[in-house]
């Protein structure tokens, strides 16, 4: 009897664990996307962390990291979306820009405003997404490639 109760308890915990992870985005998972320099802009490394939680309060989060960029510099990173065009062949819409300031070593980080579920209502499907970092003269200095992002 103790063995049956132990197995039942373990099965219940496993079910709870599976149910809680199933609420995360099944179509698009968290991804770290590399930022690459445009022309000769200095950059040791850079990335965008794109997180799709698909929660009732938070649909998505984004984090931005620069390492070895220009020191003590102001940048802005733009989220651009090619709506229903996962190849990024057509025109893009710029959804928002987020400021990033670097320290004396050229390192900086920032996060986008939380994206609520209602902001993506009606956009279910595949989209081409890329991120572009602009310097204070509004010139693109870093960018990602085209990422195929599926919203569900």
Model regions and ranges:
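N-terminal leader/targeting pre-sequences
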Residues: 24-152
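C-terminal segment of classical bacterial N-terminal signal peptides
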Residues: 14-22
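Positively charged n-region of N-terminal signal peptides that target proteins for export
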Residues: 1-4
